[in-house]
Protein backbone atom coordinates (compact mmCIF):
# COMPACT_ATOMS: atom_id res chain seq x y z
CA UNK A 1 0.00 0.00 0.00
CA UNK A 2 0.98 3.63 -0.11
CA UNK A 3 0.56 6.14 2.64
CA UNK A 4 -2.07 7.94 0.62
CA UNK A 5 -3.88 5.37 -1.49
CA UNK A 6 -6.44 6.60 -3.94
CA UNK A 7 -10.13 6.12 -3.31
CA UNK A 8 -12.49 4.47 -5.72
CA UNK A 9 -15.53 6.48 -6.71
CA UNK A 10 -19.02 5.54 -7.77
CA UNK A 11 -20.29 5.58 -11.33
CA UNK A 12 -22.88 7.94 -12.67
CA UNK A 13 -26.30 7.29 -11.26
CA UNK A 14 -27.84 7.59 -14.74
CA UNK A 15 -26.04 5.95 -17.64
CA UNK A 16 -28.05 6.58 -20.78
CA UNK A 17 -30.75 9.13 -19.96
CA UNK A 18 -30.51 12.85 -19.58
CA UNK A 19 -33.09 13.60 -16.97
CA UNK A 20 -36.15 15.73 -17.36
CA UNK A 21 -35.83 16.81 -13.76
CA UNK A 22 -32.99 18.01 -11.59
CA UNK A 23 -32.76 14.96 -9.35
CA UNK A 24 -32.16 12.56 -12.23
CA UNK A 25 -30.03 15.00 -14.17
CA UNK A 26 -27.42 15.39 -11.47
CA UNK A 27 -24.59 12.91 -11.60
CA UNK A 28 -22.14 11.59 -9.07
CA UNK A 29 -18.66 11.50 -10.49
CA UNK A 30 -17.05 8.74 -12.52
CA UNK A 31 -14.04 6.65 -11.56
CA UNK A 32 -11.75 8.28 -14.09
CA UNK A 33 -12.42 11.75 -12.71
CA UNK A 34 -10.47 10.81 -9.64
CA UNK A 35 -7.21 10.18 -11.48
CA UNK A 36 -6.15 13.78 -10.96
CA UNK A 37 -6.36 13.21 -7.23
CA UNK A 38 -4.60 9.86 -7.34
CA UNK A 39 -1.59 11.22 -9.19
CA UNK A 40 -1.24 14.38 -7.16
CA UNK A 41 -1.63 12.64 -3.81
CA UNK A 42 0.91 9.99 -4.72
CA UNK A 43 3.35 12.78 -5.52
CA UNK A 44 2.62 14.33 -2.16
CA UNK A 45 3.13 10.96 -0.51
CA UNK A 46 6.62 10.55 -1.95
CA UNK A 47 7.64 14.01 -0.92
CA UNK A 48 6.31 13.51 2.57
CA UNK A 49 8.05 10.21 3.04
CA UNK A 50 11.36 11.23 1.57
CA UNK A 51 11.68 14.51 3.40
CA UNK A 52 10.26 13.47 6.74
CA UNK A 53 11.28 9.84 6.96
CA UNK A 54 14.87 9.95 5.76
CA UNK A 55 17.34 9.54 8.51
CA UNK A 56 20.23 10.64 6.33
CA UNK A 57 20.85 12.15 2.92
CA UNK A 58 19.43 15.20 1.24
CA UNK A 59 15.95 15.72 -0.12
CA UNK A 60 17.37 15.71 -3.63
CA UNK A 61 18.66 12.15 -3.56
CA UNK A 62 21.11 9.77 -1.93
CA UNK A 63 24.84 10.24 -2.28
CA UNK A 64 27.31 7.37 -2.55
CA UNK A 65 27.99 7.79 1.16
CA UNK A 66 24.28 7.54 1.88
CA UNK A 67 24.01 4.36 -0.18
CA UNK A 68 26.99 2.91 1.66
CA UNK A 69 25.32 3.73 4.96
CA UNK A 70 22.10 2.10 3.78
CA UNK A 71 23.93 -1.07 2.80
CA UNK A 72 25.67 -1.16 6.17
CA UNK A 73 22.32 -0.83 7.91
CA UNK A 74 20.91 -3.75 5.92
CA UNK A 75 23.92 -5.85 6.85
CA UNK A 76 23.38 -5.00 10.51
CA UNK A 77 19.76 -6.20 10.68
CA UNK A 78 20.61 -9.35 12.70
CA UNK A 79 22.42 -7.21 15.28
CA UNK A 80 19.42 -4.86 15.45
CA UNK A 81 17.10 -7.78 16.07
CA UNK A 82 19.34 -9.02 18.87
CA UNK A 83 19.42 -5.57 20.45
CA UNK A 84 15.66 -5.21 20.28
CA UNK A 85 15.18 -8.53 22.06
CA UNK A 86 17.73 -7.68 24.75
CA UNK A 87 16.61 -6.66 28.24
CA UNK A 88 18.86 -3.61 28.37
CA UNK A 89 16.93 -0.38 27.73
CA UNK A 90 19.86 1.42 26.13
CA UNK A 91 20.49 -1.50 23.79
CA UNK A 92 16.79 -1.52 22.91
CA UNK A 93 16.87 2.20 22.12
CA UNK A 94 20.01 1.97 20.00
CA UNK A 95 18.74 -1.03 18.05
CA UNK A 96 15.28 0.47 17.50
CA UNK A 97 16.86 3.72 16.34
CA UNK A 98 18.93 1.81 13.78
CA UNK A 99 15.86 -0.15 12.72
CA UNK A 100 13.96 3.09 12.17
CA UNK A 101 16.84 4.41 10.02
CA UNK A 102 16.89 1.17 8.06
CA UNK A 103 13.17 1.49 7.35
CA UNK A 104 13.64 5.14 6.36
CA UNK A 105 16.12 4.65 3.53
CA UNK A 106 14.94 6.20 0.29
CA UNK A 107 15.21 3.29 -2.10
CA UNK A 108 13.68 -0.10 -1.39
CA UNK A 109 13.52 -0.12 2.41
CA UNK A 110 13.64 -3.78 3.53
CA UNK A 111 10.20 -3.78 5.15
CA UNK A 112 9.49 -7.44 4.39
CA UNK A 113 12.84 -8.54 5.78
CA UNK A 114 12.17 -6.66 9.00
CA UNK A 115 8.69 -8.19 9.30
CA UNK A 116 10.07 -11.66 8.63
CA UNK A 117 12.66 -11.19 11.37
CA UNK A 118 9.82 -11.38 13.88
CA UNK A 119 10.61 -8.16 15.76
CA UNK A 120 7.31 -6.35 15.14
CA UNK A 121 5.48 -7.65 18.26
CA UNK A 122 8.51 -6.73 20.37
CA UNK A 123 8.66 -3.21 18.93
CA UNK A 124 4.92 -2.83 19.57
CA UNK A 125 5.58 -3.55 23.24
CA UNK A 126 8.00 -0.62 23.30
CA UNK A 127 5.05 1.68 22.53
CA UNK A 128 3.85 1.13 26.10
CA UNK A 129 7.09 2.33 27.69
CA UNK A 130 5.68 5.58 29.11
CA UNK A 131 8.79 5.78 31.28
CA UNK A 132 10.99 5.94 28.17
CA UNK A 133 9.50 8.40 25.60
CA UNK A 134 12.58 8.22 23.37
CA UNK A 135 12.06 4.50 22.91
CA UNK A 136 8.34 5.03 22.32
CA UNK A 137 9.14 7.57 19.63
CA UNK A 138 11.67 5.38 17.80
CA UNK A 139 9.35 2.38 18.00
CA UNK A 140 6.40 4.40 16.70
CA UNK A 141 8.49 5.73 13.82
CA UNK A 142 9.68 2.25 12.81
CA UNK A 143 6.15 0.85 12.95
CA UNK A 144 4.83 3.81 10.96
CA UNK A 145 7.20 2.98 8.12
CA UNK A 146 6.26 -0.69 8.23
CA UNK A 147 2.60 0.35 7.95
CA UNK A 148 3.50 2.32 4.81
CA UNK A 149 4.27 -0.94 3.06
CA UNK A 150 1.87 -3.53 1.66
CA UNK A 151 -1.49 -4.48 3.11
CA UNK A 152 0.18 -7.57 4.51
CA UNK A 153 2.73 -5.38 6.29
CA UNK A 154 -0.04 -3.22 7.70
CA UNK A 155 -1.92 -6.30 8.87
CA UNK A 156 1.12 -7.40 10.86
CA UNK A 157 0.97 -4.09 12.73
CA UNK A 158 -2.74 -4.57 13.41
CA UNK A 159 -2.41 -8.18 14.55
CA UNK A 160 0.38 -7.19 16.90
CA UNK A 161 -2.10 -5.00 18.78
CA UNK A 162 -0.53 -1.66 17.89
CA UNK A 163 -3.69 0.28 16.96
CA UNK A 164 -5.20 0.79 20.44
CA UNK A 165 -1.76 1.62 21.81
CA UNK A 166 -1.21 4.25 19.12
CA UNK A 167 -4.55 5.76 20.09
CA UNK A 168 -3.45 5.88 23.72
CA UNK A 169 -0.27 7.63 22.61
CA UNK A 170 -2.37 10.49 21.21
CA UNK A 171 -2.55 11.57 24.87
CA UNK A 172 1.20 11.29 25.46
CA UNK A 173 2.99 14.14 27.18
CA UNK A 174 5.57 14.03 24.38
CA UNK A 175 4.51 15.96 21.30
CA UNK A 176 6.93 13.97 19.15
CA UNK A 177 5.35 10.72 20.31
CA UNK A 178 1.84 12.08 19.67
CA UNK A 179 2.79 13.19 16.18
CA UNK A 180 4.30 9.84 15.31
CA UNK A 181 1.20 8.06 16.59
CA UNK A 182 -0.93 10.31 14.39
CA UNK A 183 1.14 9.41 11.36
CA UNK A 184 1.01 5.69 12.15
CA UNK A 185 -2.78 5.72 12.49
CA UNK A 186 -3.02 7.55 9.17
CA UNK A 187 -1.01 4.82 7.47
CA UNK A 188 -3.14 2.05 8.96
CA UNK A 189 -6.43 3.78 8.14
CA UNK A 190 -5.21 4.57 4.64
CA UNK A 191 -4.65 0.92 3.78
CA UNK A 192 -8.29 0.00 3.18
CA UNK A 193 -11.84 0.79 4.32
CA UNK A 194 -11.66 -2.26 6.58
CA UNK A 195 -8.54 -0.94 8.31
CA UNK A 196 -10.04 2.56 8.48
CA UNK A 197 -13.16 1.23 10.17
CA UNK A 198 -11.03 -0.76 12.61
CA UNK A 199 -9.13 2.36 13.63
CA UNK A 200 -12.36 4.33 14.02
CA UNK A 201 -13.96 1.51 16.01
CA UNK A 202 -11.25 1.91 18.64
CA UNK A 203 -12.37 5.52 19.10
CA UNK A 204 -9.50 7.25 17.30
CA UNK A 205 -11.46 10.24 15.99
CA UNK A 206 -11.94 12.15 19.26
CA UNK A 207 -8.30 12.05 20.41
CA UNK A 208 -7.17 12.90 16.87
CA UNK A 209 -9.40 15.98 16.81
CA UNK A 210 -7.94 17.04 20.16
CA UNK A 211 -4.57 17.49 18.43
CA UNK A 212 -5.91 20.57 16.62
CA UNK A 213 -5.46 23.64 18.78
CA UNK A 214 -3.79 27.04 18.63
CA UNK A 215 -0.54 25.61 19.99
CA UNK A 216 -0.18 22.82 17.43
CA UNK A 217 3.09 23.03 15.53
CA UNK A 218 2.96 22.99 11.75
CA UNK A 219 4.35 19.49 11.22
CA UNK A 220 1.74 18.05 13.60
CA UNK A 221 -0.97 20.10 11.91
CA UNK A 222 0.00 18.69 8.53
CA UNK A 223 0.21 15.10 9.71
CA UNK A 224 -3.01 15.27 11.71
CA UNK A 225 -4.92 16.81 8.80
CA UNK A 226 -3.65 14.11 6.47
CA UNK A 227 -4.64 11.39 8.94
CA UNK A 228 -8.07 12.98 9.38
CA UNK A 229 -8.45 12.87 5.60
CA UNK A 230 -7.68 9.14 5.63
CA UNK A 231 -10.25 8.64 8.38
CA UNK A 232 -12.88 10.13 6.03
CA UNK A 233 -11.95 8.52 2.71
CA UNK A 234 -12.77 5.21 1.10
CA UNK A 235 -15.67 3.25 -0.36
CA UNK A 236 -17.88 2.25 1.31
CA UNK A 237 -17.64 5.45 3.36
CA UNK A 238 -17.23 5.32 7.13
CA UNK A 239 -20.30 5.69 9.33
CA UNK A 240 -21.21 9.37 9.22
CA UNK A 241 -21.72 9.56 12.97
CA UNK A 242 -18.03 8.75 13.31
CA UNK A 243 -16.80 11.41 10.88
CA UNK A 244 -19.34 14.21 11.35
CA UNK A 245 -17.55 15.52 14.49
CA UNK A 246 -14.63 16.42 12.20
CA UNK A 247 -16.63 19.05 10.31
CA UNK A 248 -16.09 21.97 12.74
CA UNK A 249 -12.36 21.21 12.76
CA UNK A 250 -12.26 21.04 8.97
CA UNK A 251 -14.02 24.40 8.79
CA UNK A 252 -11.12 25.88 10.73
CA UNK A 253 -8.49 23.98 8.76
CA UNK A 254 -9.66 25.32 5.39
CA UNK A 255 -8.90 28.81 6.68
CA UNK A 256 -5.21 27.81 6.88
CA UNK A 257 -2.65 29.43 4.61
CA UNK A 258 -0.54 26.26 4.47
CA UNK A 259 -0.84 24.39 1.18
CA UNK A 260 -0.48 20.90 2.65
CA UNK A 261 -3.09 21.53 5.32
CA UNK A 262 -5.48 23.03 2.79
CA UNK A 263 -4.99 20.14 0.39
CA UNK A 264 -5.81 17.42 2.88
CA UNK A 265 -8.62 19.36 4.56
CA UNK A 266 -10.29 19.86 1.19
CA UNK A 267 -9.90 16.19 0.31
CA UNK A 268 -11.51 15.27 3.62
CA UNK A 269 -14.46 17.52 2.79
CA UNK A 270 -14.69 16.01 -0.67
CA UNK A 271 -15.02 12.55 0.86
CA UNK A 272 -17.66 13.67 3.35
CA UNK A 273 -19.70 15.42 0.64
CA UNK A 274 -19.53 12.51 -1.80
CA UNK A 275 -22.66 10.95 -0.43
CA UNK A 276 -26.35 11.46 0.15
CA UNK A 277 -28.06 14.82 0.43
CA UNK A 278 -28.17 14.75 4.23
CA UNK A 279 -24.38 14.42 4.29
CA UNK A 280 -24.11 17.26 1.79
CA UNK A 281 -26.33 19.36 4.04
CA UNK A 282 -24.07 18.71 7.01
CA UNK A 283 -21.07 19.92 5.00
CA UNK A 284 -22.97 23.06 3.97
CA UNK A 285 -24.02 23.75 7.55
CA UNK A 286 -20.40 23.49 8.66
CA UNK A 287 -19.93 26.82 6.88
CA UNK A 288 -17.18 25.74 4.49
CA UNK A 289 -18.78 26.74 1.18
CA UNK A 290 -17.61 30.38 1.03
CA UNK A 291 -14.00 29.42 1.70
CA UNK A 292 -14.09 26.53 -0.77
CA UNK A 293 -15.25 28.90 -3.48
CA UNK A 294 -12.39 31.23 -2.63
CA UNK A 295 -10.03 28.29 -3.04
CA UNK A 296 -11.24 27.77 -6.62
CA UNK A 297 -8.84 30.60 -7.38
CA UNK A 298 -5.91 29.09 -5.47
CA UNK A 299 -2.62 29.09 -7.35
CA UNK A 300 -1.85 25.47 -6.48
CA UNK A 301 -3.73 22.70 -8.33
CA UNK A 302 -3.26 20.45 -5.30
CA UNK A 303 -5.59 22.78 -3.37
CA UNK A 304 -7.84 23.85 -6.23
CA UNK A 305 -8.70 20.30 -7.30
CA UNK A 306 -10.15 19.00 -4.01
CA UNK A 307 -11.92 22.33 -3.41
CA UNK A 308 -13.52 22.01 -6.84
CA UNK A 309 -14.36 18.37 -6.19
CA UNK A 310 -16.16 19.30 -2.98
CA UNK A 311 -18.15 22.07 -4.67
CA UNK A 312 -18.98 19.61 -7.45
CA UNK A 313 -20.21 17.08 -4.92
CA UNK A 314 -22.39 19.66 -3.18
CA UNK A 315 -24.18 20.59 -6.40
CA UNK A 316 -25.16 16.95 -6.91
CA UNK A 317 -27.59 17.67 -4.08
CA UNK A 318 -31.03 19.21 -4.39
CA UNK A 319 -31.87 22.63 -5.80
CA UNK A 320 -31.66 24.37 -2.43
CA UNK A 321 -28.20 22.94 -1.78
CA UNK A 322 -27.08 23.94 -5.26
CA UNK A 323 -28.44 27.42 -4.64
CA UNK A 324 -26.22 27.74 -1.55
CA UNK A 325 -23.23 27.40 -3.87
CA UNK A 326 -24.60 29.85 -6.44
CA UNK A 327 -25.37 32.41 -3.73
CA UNK A 328 -21.67 32.45 -2.83
CA UNK A 329 -20.71 33.52 -6.37
CA UNK A 330 -19.31 30.20 -7.55
CA UNK A 331 -20.21 30.73 -11.20
CA UNK A 332 -17.58 33.41 -11.99
CA UNK A 333 -14.96 31.11 -10.45
CA UNK A 334 -16.11 28.19 -12.60
CA UNK A 335 -16.08 30.41 -15.69
CA UNK A 336 -12.50 31.37 -14.89
CA UNK A 337 -11.53 27.68 -14.84
CA UNK A 338 -13.03 27.21 -18.30
CA UNK A 339 -11.60 30.32 -19.92
CA UNK A 340 -8.04 30.33 -18.64
CA UNK A 341 -5.09 28.05 -19.14
CA UNK A 342 -5.90 25.27 -16.70
CA UNK A 343 -5.03 21.67 -17.43
CA UNK A 344 -7.51 19.24 -18.93
CA UNK A 345 -8.42 17.52 -15.67
CA UNK A 346 -9.45 20.79 -14.02
CA UNK A 347 -11.54 21.90 -17.00
CA UNK A 348 -13.19 18.51 -17.03
CA UNK A 349 -14.07 18.72 -13.36
CA UNK A 350 -15.37 22.27 -13.81
CA UNK A 351 -17.63 21.13 -16.66
CA UNK A 352 -18.90 18.25 -14.52
CA UNK A 353 -19.75 20.72 -11.77
CA UNK A 354 -21.52 23.03 -14.21
CA UNK A 355 -23.49 20.10 -15.63
CA UNK A 356 -24.91 19.42 -12.19
CA UNK A 357 -25.90 23.08 -11.86
CA UNK A 358 -27.65 23.06 -15.25
CA UNK A 359 -29.55 20.00 -14.01
CA UNK A 360 -31.28 22.39 -11.61
CA UNK A 361 -34.27 24.64 -12.09
CA UNK A 362 -34.78 27.29 -14.76
CA UNK A 363 -33.56 30.08 -12.48
CA UNK A 364 -30.29 28.23 -11.93
CA UNK A 365 -29.91 27.64 -15.65
CA UNK A 366 -30.50 31.35 -16.15
CA UNK A 367 -27.77 32.11 -13.62
CA UNK A 368 -25.38 30.00 -15.71
CA UNK A 369 -26.44 31.93 -18.82
CA UNK A 370 -26.09 35.30 -17.10
CA UNK A 371 -22.59 34.37 -15.92
CA UNK A 372 -21.49 33.94 -19.54
CA UNK A 373 -20.78 30.25 -19.08
CA UNK A 374 -22.79 28.91 -22.02
CA UNK A 375 -20.46 30.57 -24.53
CA UNK A 376 -17.43 28.96 -22.88
CA UNK A 377 -19.21 25.63 -22.59
CA UNK A 378 -19.92 25.68 -26.33
CA UNK A 379 -16.29 26.55 -27.02
CA UNK A 380 -15.22 23.56 -24.91
CA UNK A 381 -17.72 21.42 -26.79
CA UNK A 382 -16.09 22.49 -30.06
CA UNK A 383 -12.42 22.60 -29.23
CA UNK A 384 -11.39 20.74 -26.07
CA UNK A 385 -10.11 17.20 -25.58
CA UNK A 386 -12.81 14.54 -25.80
CA UNK A 387 -12.92 13.84 -22.06
CA UNK A 388 -13.68 17.52 -21.44
CA UNK A 389 -16.14 17.71 -24.34
CA UNK A 390 -18.05 14.86 -22.79
CA UNK A 391 -18.71 16.79 -19.58
CA UNK A 392 -19.59 19.93 -21.55
CA UNK A 393 -22.15 17.91 -23.51
CA UNK A 394 -23.82 16.94 -20.25
CA UNK A 395 -23.86 20.59 -19.25
CA UNK A 396 -25.59 21.72 -22.44
CA UNK A 397 -27.95 18.74 -22.53
CA UNK A 398 -29.07 19.16 -18.94
CA UNK A 399 -29.76 22.82 -19.65
CA UNK A 400 -31.95 21.89 -22.63
CA UNK A 401 -33.85 19.42 -20.45
CA UNK A 402 -34.76 21.87 -17.72
CA UNK A 403 -34.51 25.18 -19.54
CA UNK A 404 -37.24 27.39 -20.92
CA UNK A 405 -37.77 27.84 -24.64
CA UNK A 406 -36.04 31.20 -24.50
CA UNK A 407 -33.06 29.67 -22.71
CA UNK A 408 -32.80 26.91 -25.30
CA UNK A 409 -33.05 29.49 -28.10
CA UNK A 410 -30.17 31.35 -26.46
CA UNK A 411 -28.04 28.20 -26.38
CA UNK A 412 -28.72 27.65 -30.06
CA UNK A 413 -27.72 31.25 -30.75
CA UNK A 414 -24.38 30.50 -29.10
CA UNK A 415 -23.65 27.73 -31.60
CA UNK A 416 -24.34 24.54 -29.66
CA UNK A 417 -25.97 22.59 -32.51
CA UNK A 418 -22.88 21.88 -34.63
CA UNK A 419 -20.66 20.49 -31.83
CA UNK A 420 -23.57 18.39 -30.52
CA UNK A 421 -24.01 16.92 -34.00
CA UNK A 422 -20.27 16.29 -34.30
CA UNK A 423 -20.33 14.14 -31.15
CA UNK A 424 -23.01 11.81 -32.55
CA UNK A 425 -20.25 9.73 -34.15
CA UNK A 426 -18.13 9.35 -31.02
CA UNK A 427 -17.66 5.86 -29.53
CA UNK A 428 -19.02 6.78 -26.08
CA UNK A 429 -22.62 5.56 -25.89
CA UNK A 430 -23.54 7.87 -23.04
CA UNK A 431 -22.30 10.91 -24.92
CA UNK A 432 -24.22 9.96 -28.07
CA UNK A 433 -27.40 9.58 -26.03
CA UNK A 434 -26.84 12.84 -24.20
CA UNK A 435 -26.36 14.69 -27.50
CA UNK A 436 -29.46 13.10 -29.00
CA UNK A 437 -31.46 14.22 -25.98
CA UNK A 438 -30.16 17.76 -26.36
CA UNK A 439 -30.94 17.88 -30.07
CA UNK A 440 -34.43 16.51 -29.47
CA UNK A 441 -35.08 19.19 -26.86
CA UNK A 442 -33.85 21.82 -29.32
CA UNK A 443 -36.08 20.43 -32.08
CA UNK A 444 -39.11 20.63 -29.78
CA UNK A 445 -38.46 24.35 -29.37
CA UNK A 446 -38.00 24.75 -33.12
CA UNK A 447 -41.31 23.03 -33.71
CA UNK A 448 -43.03 25.30 -31.18
CA UNK A 449 -41.59 28.35 -32.92
CA UNK A 450 -42.92 27.05 -36.25
CA UNK A 451 -46.37 26.42 -34.79
CA UNK A 452 -46.43 29.93 -33.38
CA UNK A 453 -45.76 31.25 -36.85
CA UNK A 454 -42.39 32.70 -35.89
CA UNK A 455 -40.46 30.81 -38.55
CA UNK A 456 -42.98 30.35 -41.32
CA UNK A 457 -43.64 26.73 -42.21
CA UNK A 458 -40.16 25.53 -41.31
CA UNK A 459 -38.55 24.19 -38.16
CA UNK A 460 -35.41 26.28 -38.44
CA UNK A 461 -33.58 24.16 -35.89
CA UNK A 462 -34.22 21.06 -38.00
CA UNK A 463 -32.66 22.89 -40.93
CA UNK A 464 -29.69 23.91 -38.81
CA UNK A 465 -29.17 20.31 -37.70
CA UNK A 466 -29.32 19.18 -41.33
CA UNK A 467 -26.83 21.86 -42.37
CA UNK A 468 -24.51 20.69 -39.56
CA UNK A 469 -24.65 17.16 -41.05
CA UNK A 470 -26.59 16.09 -37.99
CA UNK A 471 -29.51 14.63 -39.93
CA UNK A 472 -27.24 12.22 -41.76
CA UNK A 473 -25.64 11.21 -38.47
CA UNK A 474 -29.03 10.65 -36.83
CA UNK A 475 -30.11 8.52 -39.81
CA UNK A 476 -26.97 6.43 -39.46
CA UNK A 477 -27.76 5.83 -35.78
CA UNK A 478 -30.77 3.78 -36.90
CA UNK A 479 -28.30 0.96 -37.47
CA UNK A 480 -26.61 1.40 -34.08
CA UNK A 481 -26.16 -1.70 -31.92
CA UNK A 482 -27.42 0.06 -28.79
CA UNK A 483 -31.20 -0.14 -28.57
CA UNK A 484 -31.57 3.09 -26.61
CA UNK A 485 -29.67 5.02 -29.26
CA UNK A 486 -31.57 3.31 -32.07
CA UNK A 487 -34.94 4.08 -30.46
CA UNK A 488 -34.04 7.70 -29.82
CA UNK A 489 -32.80 8.23 -33.38
CA UNK A 490 -35.95 6.69 -34.88
CA UNK A 491 -38.17 8.77 -32.62
CA UNK A 492 -36.42 11.99 -33.63
CA UNK A 493 -36.64 11.19 -37.34
CA UNK A 494 -40.29 10.16 -37.18
CA UNK A 495 -41.24 13.21 -35.13
CA UNK A 496 -39.40 15.96 -36.95
CA UNK A 497 -38.67 14.74 -40.49
CA UNK A 498 -41.47 12.34 -41.50
CA UNK A 499 -43.46 15.02 -43.30
CA UNK A 500 -40.44 16.04 -45.36
CA UNK A 501 -39.74 12.43 -46.19
CA UNK A 502 -43.30 11.85 -47.36
CA UNK A 503 -43.29 15.00 -49.49
CA UNK A 504 -40.00 13.95 -51.00
CA UNK A 505 -41.45 10.55 -51.82
CA UNK A 506 -44.41 12.13 -53.55
CA UNK A 507 -42.10 14.35 -55.58
CA UNK A 508 -40.12 11.33 -56.67
CA UNK A 509 -43.21 9.33 -57.66
CA UNK A 510 -44.63 12.12 -59.84
CA UNK A 511 -41.44 13.53 -61.33
CA UNK A 512 -41.01 13.21 -65.13
CA UNK A 513 -38.40 10.65 -66.03
CA UNK A 514 -36.30 13.23 -67.81
CA UNK A 515 -36.41 15.78 -64.98
CA UNK A 516 -35.87 13.83 -61.76
CA UNK A 517 -34.04 10.61 -61.14
CA UNK A 518 -33.91 8.38 -58.10
CA UNK A 519 -31.10 9.50 -55.83
CA UNK A 520 -30.84 12.89 -57.48
CA UNK A 521 -29.58 15.82 -55.47
CA UNK A 522 -32.17 18.02 -57.18
CA UNK A 523 -34.32 18.39 -54.05
CA UNK A 524 -36.71 21.35 -53.75
CA UNK A 525 -35.64 24.03 -51.24
CA UNK A 526 -36.53 23.15 -47.67
CA UNK A 527 -36.78 19.42 -48.42
CA UNK A 528 -34.46 16.69 -47.11
CA UNK A 529 -33.13 13.82 -49.15
CA UNK A 530 -32.87 10.54 -47.23
CA UNK A 531 -31.14 8.71 -50.07
From Swiss-Prot:
IBB domain location: 1-58
Output one GO MF annotation: nuclear import signal receptor activity
Q: Where is the composition biased (Polar residues)?
A: 511-524
**Where is this protein chiefly located?**
nucleus
Region Disordered: start-end pairs: 500-524
InterPro entries in UniProt: ARM-like (IPR011989), ARM-type_fold (IPR016024), Arm_3 (IPR032413), Armadillo (IPR000225), Importin-a_IBB (IPR002652), Importin-a_IBB_sf (IPR036975), Importin_alpha (IPR024931)
Knockout mutant characteristics: No visible phenotype under normal growth conditions, but mutant plants show enhanced disease susceptibility to the virulent pathogen H.arabidopsidis isolate NOCO2.
Q: Where in the cell is it found?
A: Nucleus
Q: Which UniProt keywords apply?
A: Nucleus, Protein transport, Repeat, Transport
Any one Gene Ontology cellular component term annotated for this protein: cytoplasm
Q: Which spans of this chain does UniProt mark as ARM repeats?
A: 111-153, 154-198, 199-236, 237-281, 282-321, 322-364, 365-405, 406-447
Q: Name one GO biological process term.
A: protein import into nucleus
Domain of life of the organism in this record? Answer: Eukaryota
Q: Which residues form the signal peptide?
A: none
Q: Name one Pfam family in it.
A: Arm_3
Family per similarity comment: Belongs to the importin alpha family.
Function of this protein? Binds to conventional NLS motifs and mediates nuclear protein import across the nuclear envelope. Acts as a cellular receptor for the nuclear import of the virD2 protein of Agrobacterium, but is not essential for Agrobacterium-mediated root transformation. May be involved in the regulation of pathogen-induced salicylic acid accumulation.
Q: How does it assemble?
A: Forms a complex with importin subunit beta-1. Interacts with PRL1. Interacts with A.tumefaciens VirD2 and VirE2.
Name by which UniProt lists this protein: Importin subunit alpha-3
Protein source organism: Arabidopsis thaliana
